[in-house]
Amino acid sequence: MTEIVLAVLFGVSLFLPFYTYVLYPLLLSLPRGKKYSEGDVLPSVTAIVCFGEGDGTAKRASVEATGYPGLETVVSRDINAAAASSSGEILVFLDHETELDPDALRNIVKLFADKRVAMVVGEQTSREGSGAFWKYETKVRRMESKFGSVSGANASLFAIRRDAMPTVPEKVRNVPFYLSAKIKQNGGDVVYCPDAKTYEKKSGTPTFRKRVSDAAGYWQAFGLFPGMLFFRRGSFVYVGHRVLKWFVWLDLTAAFLFNAALCFFGWIWIVLLALQAVFYLSVFAFSRLKGGVGGIFRVFRYFLAVSFAFLPGMFVQNQ
């Protein structure tokens, strides 16, 4: 009986990461979902530059250089005050750092022709090309868009219908994610626009400290949206794409420990534990190699770094 219980727990610990990274995208790929209309009429827009570091001078110039008719531009650290004082029908939020594509504003507002759409998320990319993990996340967002339930947004570019803009509580760490979850909870559709692009000026792998900071923001959101865990509007995406990922570090740790305990019940469990150990050691040993082999192991290293950043992230969410 003990072996059966441990084996079930071991299986569940491996299944949950498999579900969130493999089965969940497969379910999203099923041929169903919503179709959204696009319009050619350009609504009034207020561009709000409120994320990242900078005085706003360069970004204001690049935004106004898009030539969007009647554009209002606001530079402010206070997102609530900026939104409240804006006159645009559509509020477009931007950061200071990324480069804005000249057609981004025109493209991102097209989907607001469909009255179901309350928020549109733009695409952040790099002119040097994005990594495999980021391409995977972008693909998942595109599939989520079919259901009007894109989970999260890039601070570099997203837009919200003014009458759907919620108030952001103080000390929220991940404002774009909070807004996407809150708007979905309120009944609005959140969709993805791959033609509304921003470009990273610097490419590179985020530091572990940055990943921990991001994880802290997600843990905070976990406490802000408890109702989204229980079969509410958007729960399928919120749990499948986000919540299960936040616990992958725990799943992998539990799988290793349950496997270790199962070694007392037969050689097959010893082999499985050895395979786990070889996998982790190989990731750290071979991810520094150049070429295709090293590239594959760097993807796994990135996966482990992102997953285990949620452990220390639990303890800094309110700092």
What label would you give each PLM region?
Residues 43-48, 72, 178:
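Cell-envelope/extracellular polymer assembly enzymes that use nucleotide-activated donors
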Residues 102-167, 171-172:
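Long helical/loop segments within the catalytic core of UDP-sugar-dependent glycosyltransferases
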Residues 1-39:
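N-terminal membrane-anchoring/stem segments of glycan-assembly enzymes
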Residues 91:
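Short aromatic/hydrophobic "clamp" motif used to bind/position activated sugar donors
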Residues 79-84, 180-181:
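Short, conserved alpha-helix that lines the donor NDP-sugar binding/gating region
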Residues 61-70:
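Short, acidic, metal-binding catalytic loop of nucleotide-sugar glycosyltransferases
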Residues 3, 39, 245-319:
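Membrane-embedded multi-pass helical conduit in multi-pass membrane proteins
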Residues 112-115, 121, 125-136, 175, ...:
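Catalytic donor/gating beta->alpha subdomain of glycosyltransferases that bind UDP-sugars
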